[in-house]
């Protein structure tokens, strides 16, 4: 029984050390995209399309966790109504970035 417990603890330490060295999962929620027009009923789809067209780091294997669309009213740089998308995404921390 003593050796079994020691073996389990040893495996746990290997697992923990491997994740610390590789960096684990990195989660980022500050990717903002702005665009023309309002969000409307399919605002989430607009944000998802914009995210995949304008990825934060094209070389990474990313997992999109979700996007939220917000109307931004009239803004001078868009010459009319605009929207803003806020997206959360994650990637494995052992990339070369």
UniProtKB/Swiss-Prot annotation:
It comes from the Eukaryota. GO terms for cellular component: extracellular region. Disulfide bonds join 29-88, 39-69, 47-85, 67-87. Keywords: Antimicrobial, Disulfide bond, Fungicide, Plant defense, Secreted, Signal. Its main location: secreted. InterPro entries: SCRL. Residues 1-23 form the signal peptide. PANTHER family: DEFENSIN-LIKE PROTEIN 241-RELATED, DEFENSIN-LIKE PROTEIN 245-RELATED. Belongs to the DEFL family. This is Putative defensin-like protein 240. It comes from Arabidopsis thaliana (Mouse-ear cress).
């Amino acid at each position: 029984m003593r050796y079994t417990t020691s073996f389990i603890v040893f495996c746990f330490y290997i697992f923990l050390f491997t994740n610390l060295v590789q960096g684990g999962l990195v989660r980022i929620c500050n990717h903002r995209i702005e665009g023309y027009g309002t969000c409307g009923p399919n605002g989430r789809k607009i944000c998802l399309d914009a995210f995949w067209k304008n990825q934060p780091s094209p070389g990474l294997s990313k997992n999109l966790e979700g996007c939220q669309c917000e109307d931004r009213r009239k803004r001078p740089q868009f010459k009319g109504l605009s929207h803003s998308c806020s997206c959360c995404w994650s990637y494995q921390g052992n990339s070369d970035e």
